[in-house]
Structure formats: structure tokens, C-alpha cells
Amino acid sequence: MHRAAAVDTTPKIVFYYKCLLNKNWNEPINNIFWGEFFLLQPRLEVLSQLLRECPKQELTVNGPKFHSMYLYISEILKSKAESLRIRNSLATLQTFLAELSVRKPTDVNFTIFLLLGNIDSIDIQFSAFIKNLCQLVKDSEDVQSVEISLRFVLHFVSFLYNSSFISHIYGNYDVFSTLYTVILKRKFGFETAVYAIGLLSACDKFETVNTFRLGLSKIVDEEFFSSVLSSSAQQLISLRDFYVSIKPDNPLTGSFFNLFSLRSSSNNPDSDQESQFSRLPDERATMFFTIYELCCCNKLFLKKLVEGGEKNGEAPLEALLSLLSYINTHQRQSERSHHFSILSLILFHIIIDDRSLLYRLTDKKFKISVRVCSQRYPYPPNATKPATPLGYMLDICCIGIQHNMKLNLSATMYFLYFSFVYRAMTSLVQDGIRMEYHWLELWRVLFSFLDFVSVLINTSPTEDVTRLLELILDVLAYIISNGDALVIRSDELVDLFYKLLHSSKNFSSFSSKIPDERLGALNYLLEVTEYLTSKTVDLPRSTADEVESVIKLELESIPVAKQNAFGGVPPFKESQYRLFHKRASRGMADLLRRKSEAAN
């Protein structure tokens, strides 16, 4: 009994783990050792625990052992007959990366040099490792090996994302060609490759020449685009449905509710639901990054997104717009939501800037059905009614404006929302397009925001508030001057001028707040309101119906703005928002890394 009790039942692989981490264990480590090591069933939980308990000094002393493991893995990746060893070795290496990086997450260089070797040989050895890994993914017929290799690539990308070593990956043609081939052929696990191309394309794109991004810009294969869009749509729908699982959408109503009346509605999310929303969007939003980056660098993909559709289920554009409505509704809940809301607006600007797509965005023959978020008041009217893509994009802007207002001042968000509205209006007028849309609700949002800014400009005047006031006045002046070229029904135009009259009480205080060279829009709005006031001042009771009747009679006589009377559409450059882009991409890389480590 005593002899039996003394038998060591420690699994052999655990014994080897302890040997590797023991600085006094000096037995030779060669390919024979690693060959047996990676045939044994990994005990990754045990390895993680041992790595966490090992002092940093001992890790440093044992660095040559870890580097030997890395070199063996690099070589074995070239052998198609070693599927078991390949799967075990990549899982083990991923655990090493995860646990060592957690020890000092602000400095991945310690982990990199510990595993990958000294500075003299790291470039050559790392390039060989990446090349062999990519070749395995392209050539292997073992489904499990391909899947785990792709997961390792994604983890490696997210692990190296904040270091200078990431350029060794996005600058490596083998990586690009491998991910392209996997997606094109829809190999098992290709969804992981779709995640990876979004992160790699976004990395350092404003600071250096990202050759991975250049490769994406040259793709013309529609099968590749279809694979990306179908995979992305599934993930975007899944994420959207997760929002809905936290809180079902409210019953739909006929119009936007008043901005200030329903902030505390019992149908708004409770504190527990707000907490859950604050953790979204999750790693599935990386698919949005992929769509975003491809739209930025590849016009053919952008065209495919806008014009392409699926006969069964939600089309990719429908899925994308639906998710963005939820993200913009909850964009004040977390920094990640805020960043993705900004990226969604940048994408809207990129789409509207492509004039060849405007017809598709506005033609009623190409209406789509998008599930728009109604989890929080206020929300758009007729959210289930088919509409044009541009109509839904304007709805998302209205959602974001109203949910951002009063609660916090995010000047960047406002500038993007209103500059998009301005850009959309000018595009419609210049192309002579009258779009079917619930214009009355857009007027309501614009004038509600004007009331909001009028309070800010008098109580908390800042440079940002002044710029916002100038922008909203430019937008309103342009719409007032060109309203007949936008709307289809005259009652929509009448309502616009009625709301202008109702808000005119604020105009007199604006003159002293705006520089003289920027007063053109305000002066034009004052001219129009003075004209309409002169026509309605003698009404017996000045009821809404009476005022609207007079406005309807005067539509043809309302003063027209002089050419260049007010500011044009603000110039747009994606690089203006590089900081938000970098924070969003690095945040998603970090989230993917942590998810991968937790799953491992």
C-alpha cells in the first residue's frame, strides 16, 4: 500500500512542463525531445498555472528552451504528416504567448524576445515561421490543423498589434495571399480569416504604407467579396440579435417622440440592461472593421455592398445598417460604442461621396428592409416599412443626434452627423433627386438640436459650440433654400417653414456669437422669417392651421438665398479621425486577444 501510494501519477507532459520551467534542469533539449513532447496530450490549464507561478527571472533564464521550442514548431509546420504535433504545438505556443503577455501587458517585447530569439536572428526566423504557417494553411487537407492555424494567426495578430513587430505580418505577402486564398475558397474556418484581414488592413494605415491594405485595394474577384459579405452579415446579425436578447425592441409608433419628454420612460433600458449594453459591441464587431476597411480601399467592394443582396434573409447592407442603428442608439454606454459610432459615420461619408452609388441609395425601386433599433426613446417612425438605404442612414443619424443630446456633448459626433446630413442634402439637390422620406421627422430633429445649441451658446459658449451652431445654421439655410428640390409633398415644405418661424425667437441672440464672415446662413434665415412674419402678423388668432395656410400660399414667393451666401459642406478626410480609428482598432485587437486567451 505504501509503495503504491508513492507512485508518481503526474502526467508525463506535466513533468516536461516543470522541467522546462526549472532553471536547474539542464538535460539536452533537441528535436527528439520536442517530437515526444508534442505527441503528448497538452494540459494547457496546468501549463497556464505553472507559467503564472514562475518568477520572471527564471523565465528569462529558461528563454533558450522556449526559443528552441519555437524553432522546432517553425520546422514542423512544413510537414503535412505531422498533424497531431502541429495542433498540439500551436496550442502550446498560444498558451505561452497568452500567459507571458499577461505578466507585463504594456511591453510585449519581453515575451517576443523570450520566444522568438535575439535581435540578430529574429527577422529571418520570424519570417520563416510565418511562411511555414501560411503554407500549412494553404496546402493542408487536415481540417483541424487549418482551423487551429487560422485561430493562431488571429491570436498572433492581436497579440502583436500594439508592437512594431505587427509590420512583419501586414507587410508579409505570404500572409495576404494565404488569407485571400482561404476566404476565396471558403476553407473551413475562413470566418477567422475575415476577422484577421480587417485588423491587418486597419493597422498603422495613417502612419505608414500598409502593403496588406494595398493588396486588398487591388482585389477584383466577386467571389472573394461575396465570401466576406456573407460571413460578415452572419456575425453582424448575430451581434444585433444579442442586443435584442438583452432588451426587446419597444412597440413602434408613428413618429419620433419629443426629445426631452421620455428620457426616463419605463420602456427604456433598466440599470442591469444598461450594464450589459456597456460591454457591447463585442468581438463580432471586428467584422464591421473588415467591411469598413474594404469599403475605404476598394471601390468594387463598396459597390458590391450597396448594390448586392441576398435573396434569402437579410442582405449584408441591411444587416450592417441594422447593427449600426443599435450601436448608435447605445453609443454613450461605452468608449467602444462611441468609437464604432464614429466609424459608422465615417463610412456613411465614404458611401455618399461615391456619386455613382447615389441612384442606388435613393431610388424607391431599390428599397430595403432594415430592423432599426427601438430599445430606447426616441426612435424612428415606421421602422419596419421598406425604405431607401439613404433614408435609413439619415434615420441612424437622427437616432445618434437625439441620444447624444442633453446627456453629453460630443462635438466630433455632432460634426459627423450634421456634415453627413448636409452632404446628403447637397447630393440630392445637385442630382435632382426627390427622395421619399419622413422629412417632418428630420425637420423635428434639426430644430430640436438648434434649440439645444441655443441654450449651450448662451450658457456654456466654447469654440466647439460655436462651430456646431455655424454648421446647423448652414444645414438649415441650405434646406430652406432648396427644400422644394428635396421633398415630394408640399405639406412637408410647409412644416419646414412653420418650424423655422417657431424657432426664430433664438436667432437674434446668435449674431453676437458668430464671426462676421460666417453670418451668411443666419442672415438668410432671418430674411426668410421676417418675410413670413410680415405675412402672418395680421392673422386674427395666429393658430397653427392659419399660419400654415399662409405659408402654403407664400411658398413661391419666399426669398431665395444668394449664391455662396453661406458655408459649404465641411471638407471630409478620413485621416481627420485617425485617433478614433486607432483606438477602435487597438481596442478590438485587445478584446480578441483576451477572448482567445480565455477560450484557450
UniProtKB/Swiss-Prot annotation:
A biological process term (GO) from this entry: Golgi to plasma membrane transport
InterPro entries for the chain: ARMD3-like, ARMH3_C
One Gene Ontology CC term in the entry: cytosol
Bilayer-crossing regions: 409-429, 437-457
Subcellular location: Membrane
Major location category of this protein: membrane
Domain of life: Eukaryota
SMART domains per the UniProt record, alphabetical: DUF1741 (SM01158)
Membrane topology value: Multi-pass membrane protein
Record keywords: Membrane, Transmembrane, Transmembrane helix
Keyword Thylakoid included in the entry's annotation: no
Similarity annotation: Belongs to the UPF0588 family.
Name by which UniProt lists this protein: UPF0588 membrane protein C20F10.02c
Organism per entry: Schizosaccharomyces pombe (strain 972 / ATCC 24843)
